[in-house]
A protein has these predicted regions:
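Generic preference for hydrophobic
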Residues: 139, 171, 210-211, 230, ...
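Bilobed "Venus flytrap"/periplasmic-binding protein-like clamshell domains
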Residues: 139-160, 197, 220-295, 299-304, ...
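Short beta-strand->loop
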Residues: 208-223, 283, 317-334
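Small-molecule pocket liners
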Residues: 225-230, 336-342
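Hydrophobic residues within well-ordered alpha-helices
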Residues: 184-185, 245, 297-298, 340, ...
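Terminal disorder- and signal-encoded targeting elements
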Residues: 1-175, 190, 200-201, 205, ...
Length: 408
């Protein structure tokens, strides 16, 4: 692992409204990015219109089963102008689970002075008596089905945090978004990777300071972010497009967690923009997380699920799901990924050491990049700017920031 020059990505999301974004045609990057910041918001776009016409329910193509149950009828996949449905294996082969660095660059075009919704990131207190200087730094990564699974994966980073701060680091195994936010609010947790949708809760409730996201820094172009994929079984005859979720009886669709961006909040805002209203048009069942949603669809426990693309990619890579047995019927443009954060009361010297450990090292050749689909580089971000699309979604849903809304 080599030390590198710090890269700064203090960015700007375009000023388009959520409606403008979700209404973009999913086809080309050109107009989906345009003024709206491309990836960020157009989250409804990549597939917004393409899912409707390409997948539909496919009719029955001259047989008893509708065409969307036969992958040989699926359109050729073009990442710049995607049409659906598509096998998950096809999307993964094309690298469509992430966006490009150009998506992040588009977010940088119009920096914001303050968040559009909720409070600004808290400053470090002026009163030194309020600063935290613990012997051991408590660190937590966004909860998974097995919260301990990433402790050894992150060892190169944890070792560098110890080296740069002079503090020992304990990997805290927390099992929910609410537990993470509450632990930082009570200053029992000092460092955390908060999932995309939970970041504003952490900022507003726990005085978290998001400062960095992971990217794939290898190769010439690199990759950034993740997408919302709406998945169902290939052989599900009832669902071949987003519109097919409007069923009678209602389809049982898994949402990950109330505070999850791609697993709940974004679908509520963006699907409604396409005329499909969760809980009115289909039944919502909270699975507890993206892994659980993915496995639940694969095991026929749910009819469909909106999931984080990189999350299901990890489940597939671990051979828990056959990607040729699931299809994606709708996809978003890229969202920002997990935001790595520290509590604002952490001693300034420790804050700077933490930032060095994340931003001044190249982790591309480590277990971190291996586990996280090549994302072995951390870059600096500005919360108000890069999270603007997420805040647009949460504003449109009138989200209230309290830990009760983080409970499953």
């Amino acid at each position: 692992m080599r030390q590198v020059d710090r890269r700064k990505f203090v960015s700007g999301i375009g000023a388009a409204t959520l409606a403008g974004v979700a209404g973009c045609s999913g086809g080309s990057d050109g107009d989906s990015s345009g003024d709206s910041g491309g990836s960020d918001d157009s989250s409804g776009d990549s597939s917004g219109d393409s899912s409707g016409d390409s997948g539909g329910d496919g009719g029955d193509s001259g047989s008893d089963a509708p065409a969307h149950t036969d992958p040989s009828t699926y359109p050729d996949f073009d990442p710049s102008s995607p049409e659906f449905p598509q096998l998950l294996s096809t999307l993964l082969d094309a690298g469509f689970e992430t966006g490009a660095m150009s998506d992040l660059e588009r977010m940088q075009e119009n920096p914001r002075d303050e968040p559009r919704y909720g409070q600004a990131v808290a400053e470090t207190p002026d009163d030194e008596s309020e600063w935290l200087d613990p012997d051991t730094l408590e660190f937590s990564l966004t909860p998974t089905e097995d919260p301990t699974v990433y402790e050894e994966t992150l060892r190169p980073l944890l070792d560098n945090i110890e080296e740069e701060t002079g503090k020992s680091v304990n990997y805290a195994s927390l099992d929910s978004y609410a537990a993470q936010v509450e632990a930082m609010r009570s200053e029992r947790l000092h460092l955390a990777g908060f999932s995309t949708g939970a970041v504003p809760y952490a900022v507003n409730i726990a005085n978290a300071v998001p400062f960095s996201v992971q990217i794939d820094g290898s190769g010439e172009n690199g990759s950034f972010g993740y997408r919302l994929w709406l998945i169902t079984q290939v052989d599900n005859p009832d669902i071949g497009s987003l519109e097919d979720l409007k069923g009678d009886p209602k389809q049982n669709v898994a949402h990950a967690d109330p505070s999850s961006n791609s697993g709940n909040l974004a679908p509520r805002a963006l699907f409604a923009n396409q005329g499909v209203v969760p809980e009115e048009d289909y039944e919502v069942s909270y699975s507890g997380g993206h892994q659980q949603s993915s496995l639940g669809v694969a095991n026929d426990d749910y009819e469909a699920a909106p999931v984080c693309s990189t999350c299901i990619a990890r489940v597939i890579r671990d051979d828990q799901i056959d990607p040729t047995q699931l299809k994606c019927i709708w996809a978003s443009d890229p969202f920002p990924t997990t935001a790595f954060s520290y509590v604002n009361t952490l001693h300034p010297d420790i804050q700077e050491g933490v930032r060095r450990a994340f931003l001044d090292y190249d982790y591309q050749g480590t277990t971190i990049a291996e586990e996280f689909e090549g994302r072995g580089t951390w870059v600096e971000i500005d919360y108000a700017t890069v999270w603007d699309i997420i805040l647009q979604i949460q504003e449109s849903l009138e989200v209230e920031y309290n830990t009760g809304d983080l409970e499953e």
